[in-house]
């Protein structure tokens, strides 16, 4: 990555080092691209973001040849969803019948999952992850996004910029893009 005052050019910049951003970086680096993933936080260990890796995600990891290494990491397995209704316990869902390489939910904190994804992505020479690199704005040229400007003033250019910056997306705030919504939402809360 360039120093302040220097320009950096990449095939691809991904804004956001969460699961979607790191996975995008991994896939493009695997395809031979020069990829820079930018994460605003100094590390992945931050506020609660989730702790489940679902069978469909593990199926993708299997297709990429990564599932075995993923399952070597510490995790717990949830095969059933159970609930208590009017004092009686019920099995609400049983994943064991799924025709997938991992018919369970892997319970793993998101920061551990992101460490795994980063480790896998760093196998590819074109992958770089820059922590503590908050984006201030997007560089626009000829009606296209040409890169980003970091809060420290550095300008990083790319042939393609992907916004994977999550719920509080800077991209949706700064760029003239329409928010199409989502078919579902999740309500997160803390129990004291």
Task: Enumerate the predicted regions with their spans.
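Beta1/beta-strand and adjacent pyrophosphate-binding region of the FAD-binding site
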Residues: 4-20
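Core beta-strand elements of the Rossmann-like FAD/NAD(P) dinucleotide-binding domain
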Residues: 8-10, 151-160
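Short hydrophobic core segments
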Residues: 15, 155-166
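Glycine-rich FAD pyrophosphate-binding loop
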Residues: 29-49
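Active-site-adjacent segment of FAD-dependent monooxygenases/related oxidoreductases
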Residues: 54-120
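Central beta-strand plus flanking loop segment that forms part of the substrate or channel wall
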Residues: 110-111, 168-192
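A conserved short coil-to-beta-strand element within the FAD-binding core of flavoproteins
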Residues: 131-145
């Amino acid at each position: 990555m360039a120093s302040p005052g220097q320009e950096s050019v990449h095939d691809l910049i991904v804004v956001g080092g969460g699961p979607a951003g790191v996975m995008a970086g991994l896939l493009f680096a695997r395809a031979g691209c020069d990829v820079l993933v930018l994460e605003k936080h100094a590390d992945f260990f931050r506020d609660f973001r989730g702790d489940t890796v679902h069978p469909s995600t593990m199926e993708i990891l299997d297709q990429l040849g990564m599932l075995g290494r993923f399952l070597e990491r510490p995790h717990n397995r949830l095969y059933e969803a159970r609930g208590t209704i009017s004092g009686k316990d019920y099995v609400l869902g049983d994943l064991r019948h799924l025709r997938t390489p991992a018919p369970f939910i892997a319970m793993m904190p998101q920061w551990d999952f992101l460490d795994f994804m980063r480790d896998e992505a760093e196998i590819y020479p074109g992958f770089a992850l820059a922590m503590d690199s908050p984006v201030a704005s997007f560089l626009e040229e000829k009606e296209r996004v040409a890169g980003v400007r970091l809060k420290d003033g550095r300008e990083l250019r790319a042939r393609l910029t992907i916004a994977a910056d999550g719920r509080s997306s800077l991209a949706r705030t700064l760029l003239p893009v329409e928010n199409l919504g989502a078919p579902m939402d999740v309500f997160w809360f803390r129990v004291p």
